[in-house]
From Swiss-Prot:
Name of the protein this chain belongs to: Putative N-acetylmannosamine-6-phosphate 2-epimerase
EC number(s) reported in the record: 5.1.3.9
Similarity section: Belongs to the NanE family.
NCBIfam families: PRK01130.1
């Protein structure tokens, strides 16, 4: 799938992120839960999916036929980047046939010692036809990654790094600035409500991802139980 085909598939609809990490209620060693989430997302009308780990991506692809953004979350302390942070994770994801690979493109120190531009160029040299998405937290990071060769820039990490504003809502200003600059934007991060989604739609990015507000029942339940604590 090329870039234009991917945009045609996901634009005007919703990419739903289906993830569960160790320690979360929906995580199991053998998997099997995220494919059910993905089926529910597809039945609800999702136009794409975002998933974590080779296991989950392969299991989802067996039951759902939607374009997918794939990542591997792996910590390399003390460095902070953990979303597809090295070529090892890229190599593993390539075995899944996932349509887009997303990777941390913040300007924080990396485990492999490379710059973001060096990492992107290395991936593109090894896998020239693979679509890449930059997970970033601010305008500078997104612009840097796009100029280095990624196909899409995401606002995934805005609000989660020291280099971005701390808010509990989508970074509308960042999404708009990137769209206005002509970049192919996948808006993601802190979209908690349909009203916030509508605001993002009005900015008209190439794609939009919603995750926790749909597929993390612990997070969803807490929004209700916390009412009793106020």
């Amino acid at each position: 799938m090329n870039k234009e085909e991917f945009i045609n598939k996901i634009h005007g609809g919703l990419i739903i992120s289906c993830q569960a990490l160790p320690g979360e209620p929906l995580y199991t060693e053998e998997g099997g839960i995220m494919p059910l989430m993905a089926k529910a997302a597809q039945e609800a009308g999702a136009t794409g999916l975002r998933a974590n780990s080779v296991r989950d991506i392969k299991q989802i692809k067996k039951v759902v036929d939607l374009p997918m953004i794939g990542i591997i979350k792996r910590d390399y302390p003390p460095e902070k980047p953990y979303i597809t942070p090295t070529m090892k994770e890229v190599d593993e994801l390539m075995e899944t046939g996932v349509e887009v690979i997303a990777l941390d493109c913040t300007l924080r120190p990396r485990h492999d010692g490379k710059t973001v531009a060096e990492f992107i160029k290395e991936i593109k040299a090894k896998y020239p036809n693979q679509l890449l998405m930059a997970d970033t937290s601010n305008f500078e990071e997104a612009k840097n990654a796009y100029e280095a060769g990624v196909d899409f820039v995401g606002t995934t990490l805005s609000g989660y790094t020291e280099e971005s504003p701390k808010t509990d809502h989508p970074d509308f200003d960042l999404i708009k600035a990137l769209v206005d600059d002509g970049l192919p934007v996948i808006a993601e991060g802190k979209i908690h409500t349909p009203e916030q989604l509508k605001q993002v739609i009005d900015i008209n990015p190439a794609g939009i991802v919603v995750g926790g507000a749909i597929t993390r029942p612990l997070q969803i339940a807490k929004t209700f139980t916390s009412v009793f604590e106020k």
